[in-house]
Design a protein with these regions (language model features):
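Non-catalytic signal-transmission and effector/linker regions of two-component phosphorelay proteins
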Residues: 1-14, 116-129
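Two-component/phosphorelay signaling modules centered on CheY-like receiver
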Residues: 21-40
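Acidic, metal-coordinating helix/loop segments flanking the phosphotransfer/catalytic sites
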Residues: 41-59
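Acidic catalytic/metal-coordinating carboxylates
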Residues: 44, 70-73
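Active-site residues of response regulator receiver
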Residues: 63
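The feature encodes the CheY-like receiver
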Residues: 67
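Alpha4 helix (beta4-alpha4-beta5 surface) of REC/receiver domains from two-component response regulators
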Residues: 73, 94-109
Length: 129
């Protein structure tokens, strides 16, 4: 019971990862776990929307090309409904940077990226007010 109490009082930041590639989820899970961040994973935009209706993550790591649409299009919707949630856009398409940022992404990472790139992105969005 003591652990449950400790867990309730812990002010961990929670991340939602929206990514359909299993290997990428594993990599991100290792990074987020190392930083002692809580994280949940979904692999499409519909599940992301359902998750956001019930949970309030501090930030979202959002892939662009997903089975049911494009992350860049989801950014505008998510920012309207959940303006305080920070969004880190990740994609293998650097050309999506301008659209992602115009739509409200707080940070953009192009695949492939390094551990330091991910840590810099997380630090940057958590430093934002």
């Amino acid at each position: 019971m003591a652990n449950a109490t400790m867990k309730k009082t812990k002010l961990a930041k929670k991340m939602l990862v929206v990514e359909d590639e299993g290997e990428m989820c594993l990599i991100l899970d290792l990074i987020l776990s190392e930083r002692q961040l809580e994280s949940d994973y979904v692999n499409n935009l519909l599940d992301a929307d359902e998750y956001l209706q019930k949970n309030k993550p501090s930030a979202i790591i959002l892939d662009n090309k997903l089975p049911d649409g494009y992350g860049v299009d989801f950014i505008t919707y998510a920012k309207k409904k959940y303006p305080d949630t920070k969004i880190i856009m990740i994609t293998g398409f650097g050309t999506a940077r301008d659209v992602a940022m115009e739509n409200g992404a707080d940070y953009f990472l192009e695949k492939p990226f390094s551990l330091q790139n991910v840590n810099d992105a997380i630090d940057a969005v958590f430093a934002m007010k």
